[in-house]
Amino acid sequence: MASNKLRIYLKAYDHTLLDESAKRIAESAKKSGAIVAGPMPLPTKIRKYTVLRSVHVNKDSREQFEMRVHRRMIELVNSTDKAISSLTSVHLPAGVGIEIKQV
């Protein structure tokens, strides 16, 4: 029995850009007749880096940087060929990564 469920994972550093893209994808999937669940926020991955400010001495003086990767998931149930083709026509801004998996 073939499954018609698709999961769309979105990743971006900017959460506002990510939310707008997720909304666009969900709207285009709803217009094509698929049942949409989401966008669901997934845990944000935070990477922290600590570096010395000085090259040689002063270990007490450090600088900390962090990189946050925000993620969202959209689930499409009863996705048709029309829904999949409408997903390919959605224009996403630069900086938003997309991954589509069939469940």
UniProtKB/Swiss-Prot annotation:
One of its GO terms (biological process) is translation. The keyword Ribonucleoprotein applies. GO terms for molecular function: structural constituent of ribosome; tRNA binding. Pfam families: Ribosomal_S10 (PF00338). It comes from the Bacteria. Keywords: Ribonucleoprotein, Ribosomal protein. PROSITE patterns: RIBOSOMAL_S10 (PS00361). InterPro entries: Ribosomal_uS10, Ribosomal_uS10_CS, Ribosomal_uS10_dom, Ribosomal_uS10_dom_sf. GO terms for cellular component: small ribosomal subunit. Involved in the binding of tRNA to the ribosomes. NCBIfam families: PRK00596.1 (NF001861), rpsJ_bact (TIGR01049). Belongs to the universal ribosomal protein uS10 family. Part of the 30S ribosomal subunit. This is Small ribosomal subunit protein uS10. It comes from Fusobacterium nucleatum subsp. nucleatum (strain ATCC 25586 / DSM 15643 / BCRC 10681 / CIP 101130 / JCM 8532 / KCTC 2640 / LMG 13131 / VPI 4355).
